[in-house]
A protein has these predicted regions:
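Glycine-rich, low-complexity intrinsically disordered segments
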Residues: 1-116, 122-194
Length: 194
């Protein structure tokens, strides 16, 4: 099978094309979980671009429980193309500057994100088939995906890893109360994610 135009690699510059887009319950960047897995039951659907809607490309994927998604921080793109070496991570309350490479800030030289998600199912029926249903995603609706890889526990898990400043930062979770009338507006399967 021929490869779609992926661009050349001239002097280390590579052009990439989205292979898919993710459909989530987050139409804007506000409200999205800050990290993947923070809302483990929240499902999303991955819809492949036509050149990549080939069931053969997914053969063997059903044997994996988790996936890596490589994607673009599409809502954080700056028109001027500039980046800043220092950012203020929300994990530190937005008050302490840190080097961009010590953070997961979307404002990076190359605005690329990496998320670990749970694979719920592969659907081979429907107009957009095949599609993937995943859980625990931290992406905005319509986010372009550049690659999908299986999560390999024997090499991707590092129990001895340390978390730098993020490990010792305060937990900024808020207690949220949803009135029953508002909960009734949500499908029951999505209520568990709240």
């Amino acid at each position: 099978m021929s490869r779609p135009d992926i661009g050349g690699t001239e002097q280390g510059i590579m052009t990439v094309r989205p292979i898919a887009h993710i459909r989530t319950d987050f139409p804007e960047k506000f409200g999205i979980p800050r990290q993947s897995g923070r809302v483990p039951d929240l499902e999303a659907r991955i819809v492949f671009e036509p050149p990549y809607r080939n069931p053969d490309a997914l053969r063997g994927l059903e044997g994996f429980s988790h996936l890596w998604l490589l994607w673009q921080f599409s809502a954080a793109l700056r028109g001027d193309g500039e980046w800043q070496p220092m950012v203020r991570p929300p994990r530190l309350g937005g008050n302490t500057p840190m080097g961009v490479f010590a953070t997961r800030s979307p404002f990076r030289p190359n605005p690329i994100g990496l998320s670990s998600v749970r694979l719920c199912r592969i659907d081979y029926d429907g107009a957009d088939a095949p599609t993937l249903t995943v859980a625990g995603a931290d992406l905005m609706d319509g986010t372009p995906l550049y690659d999908i890889k299986p999560y390999l526990a024997y090499t991707d898990s590092h129990p001895e890893a340390t978390g730098g400043f993020a490990q010792n930062a305060l937990d900024h979770r808020l207690r949220v109360h949803c009135p029953p009338a508002l909960l009734d507006c949500l499908p029951e399967r999505k209520r568990a994610s709240l």
